[in-house]
């Protein structure tokens, strides 16, 4: 089970999509190395991001194409990203409502202060 994940034979179209060029050889050998990053922010909590570093090796010669980082989304990462965006939107909505209430209260305080001053000046 580990060998099909670590060593994959890629066709010409898949390689051209991943690398961004059109290789002259019909088949390539790709070695996938999974990397796990833990990102943390104060407002949104912890997010797990998994990427796969792929090294393409030419089938005819011994040369290898430079490594390309391809995002890989497993179910754990998808749930983590979903919770990240949910926490982020809740964070933004919370502070926008607080800021909106602050602006409304300061506006009404200014109007009430102005009305009190004008009332005092009239009498």
UniProtKB/Swiss-Prot annotation:
Record lineage: Eukaryota, Fungi, Dikarya, Ascomycota, Saccharomycotina
Bilayer-crossing regions: 1-21, 103-123
Record keywords: Membrane, Transmembrane, Transmembrane helix
Membrane topology: Multi-pass membrane protein
Protein name, per record: Putative uncharacterized protein YGR073C
Claim: Transmembrane is one of the keywords in the record: yes
Gene Ontology CC annotation, any one: membrane
Misc note: Partially overlaps SMD1.
Intracellular or extracellular location(s): Membrane
